[in-house]
């Protein structure tokens, strides 16, 4: 009997969150280990479908770095990175677009649909969903000066066609977006998936942005998870060395999204089964929430 009572208590805990998020949009960046492990893939698909069935509008933006690396290796193309960004020449861009739009996107869409969803795959080129310009990477030189480096067909999103996404939402579909953007001349751009998720969330004024990662969230210097971070404390946490390395662009992405109108953003542990549901519908969550 106790386990039944526990289930009832879990449902009661979720009720205010179901009411709060009903009719709202949640943008989820899907990547990392959650895309490789079969149990986690199924868990993610069921979480997204559950959100839709509860009247919430999930929008999925996926990555695909490991799949890109594998395919580039097969073609004998060696990747170079500048501050974590892949230098993307024309040959590399062809592979990136092929993998993200023709392989990974279709796999994610197929998995959601196999589990009862109504997912529709998109790239940023469809309906000019993600209009981009070339991103120049700033690199600090030995003499302290900062130089803008051209890293090829790497883009920054300057405009999101939110009408296309909203049309799909109103039709009860789940948009699944590959992070390939389009330039003014029709050229393709490789765009960081976290950046795409943040820009899409901002354009939609989403209730929440969720980034799935392979870590528990943001930790303090003692290694303890910071479950909540106020927006105005982020610069100090970076200066103090609490937020470091690859976590800085993720947190910055969340900050930018909130400043563009997103209510809250979370960096969560995608290695946890049903991490999305646990983050949204429980009091504690499974990562770090960033808010005003």
UniProtKB/Swiss-Prot annotation:
GO terms for molecular function: acetylglutamate kinase activity; ATP binding. It is found in: Cytoplasm. GO terms for cellular component: cytoplasm. It comes from the Bacteria. The keyword Kinase applies. Pathway: Amino-acid biosynthesis; L-arginine biosynthesis; N(2)-acetyl-L-ornithine from L-glutamate: step 2/4. SUPFAM superfamilies: Carbamate kinase-like. Its EC number is 2.7.2.8. GO terms for biological process: arginine biosynthetic process via ornithine; L-arginine biosynthetic process. Substrate binds at residues 64-65, 86, 190. It catalyses: N-acetyl-L-glutamate + ATP = N-acetyl-L-glutamyl 5-phosphate + ADP. It is an enzyme of class 2 (transferase). Disulfide bonds: none annotated. Catalyzes the ATP-dependent phosphorylation of N-acetyl-L-glutamate. Belongs to the acetylglutamate kinase family. ArgB subfamily. This is Acetylglutamate kinase. The lineage of its organism: Bacteria, Pseudomonadati, Thermodesulfobacteriota, Desulfuromonadia, Geobacterales.
């Amino acid at each position: 009997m106790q386990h039944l009572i526990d289930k009832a208590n879990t449902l009661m805990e979720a009720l205010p969150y179901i009411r709060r998020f009903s009719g709202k949009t949640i943008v989820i960046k899907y990547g990392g280990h959650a895309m490789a492990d079969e149990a986690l893939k199924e868990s993610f698909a069921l979480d997204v479908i559950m959100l839709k069935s509860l009247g919430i509008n999930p929008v999925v933006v996926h990555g695909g770095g490991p799949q890109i690396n594998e395919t580039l290796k097969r073609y004998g193309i060696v990747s170079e990175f500048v501050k974590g960004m892949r230098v993307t020449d024309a040959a590399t861009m062809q592979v990136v677009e092929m993998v993200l739009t023709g392989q990974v996107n279709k796999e994610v869409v197929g998995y959601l649909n196999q589990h009862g969803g109504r997912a529709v795959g998109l790239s940023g080129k469809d309906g000019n969903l993600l209009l981009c310009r070339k991103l120049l990477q700033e690199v600090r030189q030995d003499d302290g000066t900062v130089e803008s480096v051209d890293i090829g067909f790497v883009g920054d999103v300057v405009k999101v066609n939110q009408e296309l996404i909203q049309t799909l939402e109103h039709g009860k579909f789940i948009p699944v977006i590959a992070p390939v953007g389009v330039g003014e001349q029709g050229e393709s751009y490789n765009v960081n998936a976290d950046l795409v998720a943040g820009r899409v969330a901002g354009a939609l004024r989403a209730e929440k942005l969720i980034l799935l990662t392979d870590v528990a969230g943001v930790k303090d210097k003692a290694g303890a998870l910071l479950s909540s971070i106020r927006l105005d404390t982020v610069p100090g946490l970076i200066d103090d060395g609490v937020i470091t390395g690859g976590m800085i662009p993720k947190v910055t992405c969340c900050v930018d999204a909130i400043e563009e109108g997103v209510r809250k953003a979370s960096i969560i542990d995608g290695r946890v089964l049903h991490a999305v549901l646990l983050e949204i519908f429980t009091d504690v969550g499974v990562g770090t929430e960033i808010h005003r």
